[in-house]
UniProtKB/Swiss-Prot annotation:
Organismal lineage: Bacteria, Pseudomonadati, Pseudomonadota, Gammaproteobacteria, Pasteurellales
Motif DEAH box in this chain: 278-281
GO biological processes: regulation of DNA-templated transcription
Protein's UniProt name: RNA polymerase-associated protein RapA
UniProt cross-references to SMART domains, sorted A to Z: DEXDc, HELICc
A GO molecular-function descriptor: helicase activity
Family statement: Belongs to the SNF2/RAD54 helicase family. RapA subfamily.
Source organism: Haemophilus influenzae (strain 86-028NP)
UniProt keywords, alphabetically: Activator, ATP-binding, DNA-binding, Helicase, Hydrolase, Nucleotide-binding, Transcription, Transcription regulation
Entry keyword annotation includes Transcription regulation: yes
Amino acid sequence: MPFAIGQRWLSESENALGLGVITALDQRTVTIYFPAADETRIYAAAQAPLSRIVFSKGETLSHQAGWQGEILDVQNMNGLLFYLVKTPQDEDVIVQERDISPIISFSQAKDRLFSAQIDRSSHFALRYRTLCHQQAQFKSPLRGLRGTRAGLIPHQLHIAAEVGNRVNPRVLLADEVGLGKTIEAGMILQNQLFAEKVQRVLIIVPETLQHQWLVEMLRRFNLHFSLFDEERCNDFDLDAVNPFMTESLIICSLNWLETHPNRVEQALDAQFDCLIVDEAHHLVWSESAPSAAYLLVEQLARIIPSVLLLTATPEQLGQESHFARLRLLDPERFFDYQTFVKEQKRYQPVVNAIESLLANKALSAVEKNHISDLLLEQDVEPLFKAIASNNDEEQHRARQELIQALIDRHGTGRMLFRNTRQGVKGFPHRVYHQITLSEENDKIDWLINFLKLHRDEKIFVICQTAATAIQLEQILREREAIRAAVFHEKMSIIERDRAAAYFADLENGAQVLLSSSIGSEGRNFQFAANLVLFDLPTNPDLLEQCIGRLDRIGQKRDVQIYVPCAKDSPQIRLARWYNEGLNAFEQTCPMGMALFSQFEDELEKVRSNSTALSENEFSELLKQTKTVREKLKIELEKGRDRLLELNSNGGKQAQALADQIADEDNSPELVNFALKLFDIIGVEQEDLGANSIVISPTGTMLVPDFPGLKEEGVTVTFDRELALAREEMEFLTWDHPMIRQGIDLVASGDIGKAAMALLVNKQLPAGTLLIELIYIVESQSPKGLQLNRFLPPTPIRLLLDNKGNNIGEQVAFETLHSKLKPLGKNIANQMVKMARGNIEALITRGDQLVKSLAEPIITEAKNQADQQLSAEINRLQALRAVNQNIRQSEIDILEQQRTQSLDELSKANWRLDCLRVIVTNKE
């Protein structure tokens, strides 16, 4: 059928878009606007997956003005349809097709049944189960949290859930090293992407961390970012195209933007929804002279709605630098440094009261006064009485209520998340082994002997350069046939993947991984617990980064750290300074770089010449370093903000969230569904044992391509622990693109839309007709409203007997399906033709019955949306009165969302999605 502007068409692959209208045409493409979803699609005219919508005489037509009427006649003029319709006021009016409502209930299942496109009964079952799973996943509070390739760390899950659910979050992530700020940022981002709150993301990082972020986003979150640099952008300059508009997920370096102001202008014009800045503490600021890098990020942060800053802890930064970060997030709130300092002091006495509440101590009069001053709008006297009572349950409830109220009103608690190792339990110990050798050349012999003594252990060796790592691999292979993998920054991501997989293989893998000091950035090897520092890192931050490859949450054993050095060498003195001065091998040292800077001149002498300092002078350096470190440590402990820690780690709620995901990990539901999905689609499965399978495409699949399935096949696992150890495997969860897109493939396609089956039942007369009808209740609304959390596509199942009675509640789906037998396609087609009149009558009956089942679902969704959005608005309005960190713009957006959401839910409708005709026989 030829296209014409103004015609109405339906997308066969995206029914939820509603009824579209052609807005533009050329020889090769057709452009269609879908008003219900406010989306535009461009299709190749020759192969457009579209269905022309033509209504017939006698059908009901819905006008975009909201009224409905019966069609009396249809006329075609130059390819456009004009309908003569009787209005509710009994008037005959002509309706052009462009005026038809974009929200349409369209039953393709019936068309497929009567046009001999009948599927197998098992395909119908897959479709119904898929629809049920789709609904459950949209409603799940774990959506966007469970799919990360990472251990279930409560504080990370808490931050991801808390920040990810906000509208346009602007926060500072300031956890200590090793607590997973990158993972937190990725989980927040994934949560926002899943909820369709953001679509376009810009990540700005130091140049050396670009590949680390690229790897982390892909391996942990299945997010495909693009690296941008000058060479890539130059390709678009000739076409006068803004390069930042060519991709949705972009990573670039801060240094590149600094040196190319024109690229900053292009980034500002690219309408990003979310900005993430790593190492934000390097953005130098003072009131009189902010740095160029700071001003650059400030420009972007002003116009991009969501901002995540990853930074060192406030204690490491100092107050002024910490204020500068907060100023990027909310310049109106944090406008003056001295005002900020005074406000912070106001909260210090409250921290002491929090300590008493946490320790179940009685509150002093002074502590009560401080709490009352901060909670002026709340009558806290009943809570104080409950705390002083003898009722343990009342005491606990009152303490928790007070703590929560204080957290909500904390000066920066809503914007700042900072966890410390002291506040987060579960870390292993670090055990330092100093290996003193006679000569520098003895290192290789020592390493070979060490590897031979620990043949059953995985050993991670860090060298200064890639060249050293490559040389060592050759020596180990040629001299002792020791299996070693090499890992360095000159390798491609795929090559590093292979090396990591070779090292991770517990049966036939490498015993040792030889890595350059920066080659392993972004990679974690918790399955190994032995670290050899063949060359010492040149500063404390690099040292912590190297140890952090093994010493992370999730490490099950104590980390053994071996440092081989020649006696009287610069390296052994540097090792002693790290150990005796900083205690940096066996503990994290937040003040390490500050001490490194303070003693930089002396350390330069140590590194360049082992005799530049006498033994007495070196001993004095160790003593001074230790003294300053202890002093700084005491100051840091005094400044501990328990209120902030409580807000950051999530407490019992965070643990409950982790437990929920663990329970889902252990459930067989996903495994059963995925294997059935692969089986019916025609994906080949090869069981590898050890909780993993290889899936490969075949020439007999029901679809041309299965999402995420490579031609050479993919190894997948449903086991979180195995996925952490084997990065080359895909970790399948309900959030994985392969599962989500597999669900979409079935739900939005034609698989199982119309089926027929035989029920052998001696108690029913032969030829008895039953029909199973699956309707979908849904809202065709703009994605940004995220109405799927209130009303996801919801299946309603009817099972009608030959008299039109719904017996679905008496006969469960799985019970019925297990008793059905397949019918040959020719027989099925003949029976449909013979019973067409009865089938049509039963479908009409189903259309009448479903209304009473669908309307309560829509009403419940409206009530849920009203309650949830109103509660959040009321909470934020109450908090804004006492905590200026609540932005009025955030409340305004929520109020707009509430009004628009209720309006869209009122327009929700239902449609027949699929059906199964069942015929009985005695045998």
